[in-house]
UniProtKB/Swiss-Prot annotation:
PTM per Swiss-Prot/TrEMBL: Phosphorylation on Ser/Thr by MAP kinase kinase kinases (RAF or MEKK1) positively regulates the kinase activity. Phosphorylated by MAP2K1/MEK1. Low levels of autophosphorylation have been observed.
Designated name of the protein: Dual specificity mitogen-activated protein kinase kinase 2
Tissue expression from the record: Expressed in adult intestine, kidney, liver, lung, pancreas, spleen, thymus, and at high levels in the neonatal brain. Lower expression is found in adult brain and heart.
GO term, biological process aspect, one: positive regulation of DNA-templated transcription
Gene it is expressed from: Map2k2
Membrane topology: Peripheral membrane protein
């Protein structure tokens, strides 16, 4: 069983969001909260645009008040998975568009109340790299978690349109994920526990944010029996049931980056034919320049994937075969010749099987790939809007390739 965490910062009482009755706030208390919040924002290393956007979100949030089921108008479904369904909804009293995650749980009232209480720590998670939180409440057998709506969706959805995500774009993704993980760890002593493409959200302003991190131990425990996955982003040490730490999140990030770069979940690794279909030319394997193996391999678990002009007809890897592969076989890697050596080395450092030898957050933040990516002007918003055919609200910089 996962250990319970306790919030390390005093809760920000911006607004009452537990559906057990609103708590009155005075004008003086609101001003004190804003001063407290201002101090917390000053502690973060934000540029002017990030600070203004975060302040704008928190100003909107302060006007929301108590969240109730009757106040929401469902617009569309955004996605499903991880034990819940996420819908795009309008909060009628405020007029705000939110992402509302509904999790159906057969639980006792005491457990439900504990989950709602534990979720309140999300009010303290104010970062440009963390999806904004409006509140959580319980209604008709469902926990509702109300979040900032990200109009670009998740990176697994973006990947379906893009087919592969360019290295310079993934550089910006890597920076955001590392900074988000560092924020959770340093400011709140929280591990994410579920880093994967579907939990990295993007929007047409070019923001990249983490969502669905393990803030509620009780919710994790309550959902454990209902989770059935076809892919795993868990580290070898976590799959083996041994002690794990933020190093496990780093493995998950590395695996996600390989998937986004090559266009599909990377276990088992693609063979030469599949890589040639994906990249449009023969791809070499490793530093020795040898071609990738042409021997047929099982395809990744889940639905068949498109290869070239047809569907992949290889037998799917069973989930137990996948987990065994992660634990016992060599880790995935990026193919040579199509990515920079810096990017390849960065991913390799994330995917070292021994967590004691795996790179930590500090080392990765100082890696040459990250330093190069920080210095590059990449129009992430423009690339995303072209890929998803979204209207772009921001000013482009350099066109991403």
């Amino acid at each position: 069983m996962l250990a319970r965490r306790k919030p390390v910062l005093p809760a920000l009482t911006i607004n009452p969001t537990i559906a057990e009755g609103p708590s009155p706030t005075s004008e003086g208390a609101s001003e004190a909260n804003l001063v407290d919040l201002q101090k917390k924002l000053e502690e973060l290393d934000l540029d002017e645009q990030q600070r203004k956007r975060l302040e704008a979100f928190l100003t909107q949030k302060a006007k929301v008040g108590e969240l109730k089921d009757d106040d929401f108008e469902r617009i569309s479904e955004l996605g499903a998975g991880n034990g819940g369904v996420v819908t795009k909804a309008r909060h009628r009293p405020s007029g705000l568009i939110m992402a509302r995650k509904l999790i159906h749980l057969e639980i006792k009232p005491a457990v439900r109340n504990q989950i709602i209480r534990e979720l309140q720590v999300l009010h303290e998670c104010n970062s440009p790299y963390i999806v904004g939180f409006y509140g959580a409440f319980y209604s008709d057998g469902e926990i509702s978690i109300c979040m900032e709506h990200m109009d670009g969706g998740s990176l697994d959805q973006v990947l379906k349109e893009a087919k592969r995500i360019p290295e310079d774009i993934l550089g910006k993704v890597s920076i955001a994920v590392l900074r988000g993980l560092a924020y959770l760890r340093e400011k709140h002593q929280i591990m994410h526990r579920d880093v994967k493409p579907s939990n990295i959200l993007v929007n047409s302003r070019g923001e990249i944010k983490l969502c669905d991190f393990g803030v509620s131990g009780q919710l994790i425990d309550s959902m454990a029996n209902s989770f059935v996955g076809t892919r795993s982003y868990m580290s070898p040490e976590r799959l083996q049931g041994t002690h794990y730490s933020v190093q496990s999140d780093i493995w998950s990030m590395g695996l996600s980056l390989v998937e986004l770069a090559i266009g599909r979940y990377p276990i088992p690794p693609p063979d030469a034919k599949e890589l040639e279909a994906s990249f449009g030319r023969p791809v070499v394997d490793g530093a020795d320049g040898e071609p990738h193996s042409v021997s047929p391999r099982p395809r990744p678990p889940g639905r068949p994937i498109s290869v070239g002009h047809g569907m992949d007809s290889r037998p799917a890897m069973a989930i137990f075969e996948l987990l065994d592969y992660i634990v016992n076989e060599p880790p995935p890697k990026l193919p040579s010749g199509v990515f920079s050596s810096d990017f390849q080395e960065f991913v390799n450092k994330c995917l070292i099987k021994n967590p004691a030898e795996r790179a930590d957050l500090k080392l990765l933040m100082n890696h040459a790939f990250i330093k190069r990516s920080e210095g590059e002007e990449v129009d992430f918003a423009g690339w995303l809007c072209r890929t998803l055919r979204l209207k772009q609200p921001s000013t482009p910089t350099r066109t991403a390739v």
